[in-house]
Amino acid sequence: MLLYMSLGGVLVGFVSTWFTFKYFPFAEYLTPLLHDDTLAGIGFIQCRILLPLIVSLLLAARNGAIIAADLGYRVNRKQIRAMQNLGIPHRIYLQTTILAALVISGLLMTVMSLGISAWVSMETWSLLFPDDSLHIWRESFFSSLTRGDGLLPQGTGWVLAKVVGSAAAIGFAGLYFGLAEKKSVIDINRGIAQSIVTSVSLLLVIHTAVSLIEF
């Protein structure tokens, strides 16, 4: 999982920085004028839009499938019914812990991916502008996130809304399709596919809606 998310951070950090500056239109004339604002825009896009979306998509693709598969197997093998017969609170034991774990892991993976993406972006920028000081990168990259007097970076609440909302949507989709009646392995596989499609659709709606409200 860590490698999975780290790769996403590496790709976002490199691609957004390299291709923005490498193929900047009329770079010889505009780069000296727009360099700092462009770097601030890259930091804004990475931290506020791209990384939360990438983390949510990777969570849906991996964890959503795992949840649906695990619960589908339990239902097919009558393990859920056995828990009910034994008086074990399966809603707390399974459903609550799954949702809590998804939200916490989503937040942790977002923070980790943001750090990796920023570091890769810095190294990529340093490769493109070897004669410039890294102080310029730090000042410009985070400038759009540190405006204001708050303790947290600007827009933290919106990022939390996207990540937490997406994690909850992934969890509910996995629980819904995973706990549905399963009579065969085909039903389990169908539940996995339905969980992934539904969770990805929901998180795209959540990110779009929050971004429209935010901006």
Place the predicted regions along the sequence by residue.
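Hydrophobic alpha-helical transmembrane segments of multi-pass membrane transport/permease proteins
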Residues: 2-24, 199-209
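Selective transmembrane-helix segments that form parts of the transport pathway or gating/packing helices
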Residues: 2-6, 50, 54, 63, ...
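Membrane-interfacial helix-loop-helix connectors in multipass membrane proteins
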Residues: 18-47, 112-164, 172-191, 214
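Selective recognition of hydrophobic, aromatic-rich stretches within alpha-helical transmembrane segments
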Residues: 58, 62, 160-168
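Short cytoplasmic-facing helical segments at TM-TM junctions of multi-pass membrane proteins
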Residues: 71-95, 185-188
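Juxtamembrane boundary at the C-terminal end of a transmembrane helix
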Residues: 209-215
